Swiss-Prot record:
Annotated PROSITE patterns: SSRP
Record GO terms (molecular function): RNA binding
Domain of life per record: Bacteria
Name of the protein described by the UniProt record: SsrA-binding protein
One GO term of the biological process aspect: trans-translation
NCBIfam families xref list: PRK05422.1, smpB
Amino acid sequence: MSIVDNKKAFFDYFIEERFEAGLVLEGWEVKAIRAGRVHVKEAYVVIRKAELFLIGCHITPLLSASTHIVPDSTRTRKLLLNAIEIRKLIGKVEQKGYTLVPLNLHFTKGNVKCEIGLARGKKQHDKRAATKEREWEVQKGRIARGDLNA
């Protein structure tokens, strides 16, 4: 069950490969994610010392959060993957043109997981072509239904 999707990632990048990673979260963050108070649109993944981190993911704390903690809504969160997967990703990202982007957050067996994608950036003309293709699909659907004046 997907909590939040990063639609901008699919518009800006060609997704070559997908990986599911665990997240190191605090208790208030899990509660806020369950309530749907999370945004991954501006988030990205970096590699530091053979570890992956999610940066820029905004989790808005609940109003009922504890008073003895100070919630940091945009803190850096560690991603958990197998060592083999991390080495594979490091090798791919070191190639020119590849990056890691978060695609969505979802629950797997009660745990919050982040699906990250090995991505290659789209050029402006690729984005335009994708938009034209989407518009043509909508137009074909209208023609098939007989709704020509829309």
